[in-house]
Amino acid sequence: MQVQCQQSPVLAGSATLVALGALVLYVAKPSGYGKHTESLKPAATRLPARAAWFLQELPSFAVPAGILARQPLSLFGPPGTVLLGLFCVHYFHRTFVYSLLNRGRPYPAVLIFRGIAFCAGNGFLQSYYLIYCAEYPDGWYTDIRFCLGVFLFILGMGVNIHSDYILRQLRKPGEITYRIPKGGLFTYVSGANFLGEIIEWIGYALATWSLPALAFAFFSVCFLGLRAFHHHRFYLKMFEDYPKSRKALIPFIF
């Protein structure tokens, strides 16, 4: 049975992402994992970082991958399937590579459940729109929005992966010591990994030219931007020799 596009869930889901992003900025507190676990009660249940990240990120891959699996196989099929494939590539890496290499602190269980719900909902929203609602002209693959958007997506993913690699090298297995990250975009900002992911989703919003992707990019800017800001304050407080010229998220600006 062919699924018909319904605009109501698309609009509702997009509005929810925007509202969540605005709420993050209003609360102005970082989510309590990683460097900011001290904000939680000591008795809070925690899971090992690798298992936690795997469980949390899995729906963002499994939901769109499951929907894609029901579509006709084609390398350059409808633009919606190709763009959703890019979404799956990002979350394949986050689920099966990043999570298994993670050397972070134990992750609060309550945040895992929130993350699973968010990832499942957002994964479905992006998939539903691109597969059942999006309509692109025949020349979309050569459109400047698609080309520039995909370029930014790949660039941002490269920055994100390279920055995560730098962070992993700062800590030996089992260590919880923090050190000053150096190299790559960390030369200019404290949140190089966050900047890379933000660039990714801005590029994705441009390439898809869709409301759900734009709403997700907005949420990412709010959530990751705030986290970069608090990471920057953390480093400045912990290290007296932290580079004073380094910014939080945007080189030379913020």
Swiss-Prot record:
Catalysed conversion reaction: a 3-oxo-5alpha-steroid + NADP(+) = a 3-oxo-Delta(4)-steroid + NADPH + H(+); 17beta-hydroxy-5alpha-androstan-3-one + NADP(+) = testosterone + NADPH + H(+); 5alpha-pregnane-3,20-dione + NADP(+) = progesterone + NADPH + H(+)
Positions of transmembrane segments: 8-28, 72-92, 146-166, 206-226
Record carries keyword Transmembrane: yes
InterPro entries: 3-oxo-5-alpha-steroid_4-DH, 3-oxo-5_a-steroid_4-DH_C, SRD5A/TECR
GO CC terms of this entry: endoplasmic reticulum membrane
Effect of pH on activity: Optimally active at acidic pHs.
Biological processes annotated in GO: androgen biosynthetic process; cell differentiation; sex differentiation; testosterone biosynthetic process
UniProt-listed Gene3D superfamilies: 1.20.120.1630
Membrane topology: Multi-pass membrane protein
GO molecular function terms attached to this record: 3-oxo-5-alpha-steroid 4-dehydrogenase (NADP+) activity; testosterone dehydrogenase [NAD(P)+] activity
Annotated disulfide bonds: none
First-tier enzyme category under EC: oxidoreductase
Localization (cell): Microsome membrane; Endoplasmic reticulum membrane
Keyword set, alphabetical order: Differentiation, Endoplasmic reticulum, Lipid metabolism, Membrane, Microsome, NADP, Oxidoreductase, Sexual differentiation, Transmembrane, Transmembrane helix
Top-level taxon of the source organism: Eukaryota
Enzyme Commission code(s) on record: 1.3.1.22
Function: Converts testosterone (T) into 5-alpha-dihydrotestosterone (DHT) and progesterone or corticosterone into their corresponding 5-alpha-3-oxosteroids. It plays a central role in sexual differentiation and androgen physiology.
Family note: Belongs to the steroid 5-alpha reductase family.
Protein name: 3-oxo-5-alpha-steroid 4-dehydrogenase 2
Organism: Macaca fascicularis
